[in-house]
Amino acid sequence: MIQYKKFNRALCLLDPYGLHLDWEVMLQAGQSRAVDMFLNFPVMDMNRNAIWKDPDKVPKGGVDRMTKFWGDESWKQVAYAESRQANFFEPEMVKQDNQQIVTAFRERLKKVAGFDHVAEPLPMKNSTKAVVYYLFLASQKSVAEKIIDDIFSKYR
């Protein structure tokens, strides 16, 4: 295992096939304090397989993969909020936009995984301009965030 106390450093590039990535990988990278990580955050796959307008219709496999990717079920509170419109029977859950999910995951990388610096992610679009991924950089070094912010700003 790479450890900060041994002065080892590593760069980890994570490009998961959809939601097929375990949170434990990101958690270990952050807690090692020795790994800088690029992550393609698969927001399109999340929308296709786990975060639907009607959360009750999402297949169990999609929910399970999202939970494994996120690390726990807290993603549900991020992905859905109670509707502000009155409903006489029970509160209706409304799907939140991608930016809310991305912002919450950025905070999760900082607060839960332990990365000190997580750059504002860059949306990666396909040929029809739909966002497929968000490219994250998570690091322990402020200079890494500064460099990536400078590079990403050229593509926003």
Each language-model region and where it sits:
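Class I S-adenosyl-L-methionine-dependent methyltransferase catalytic core
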Residues: 1-156
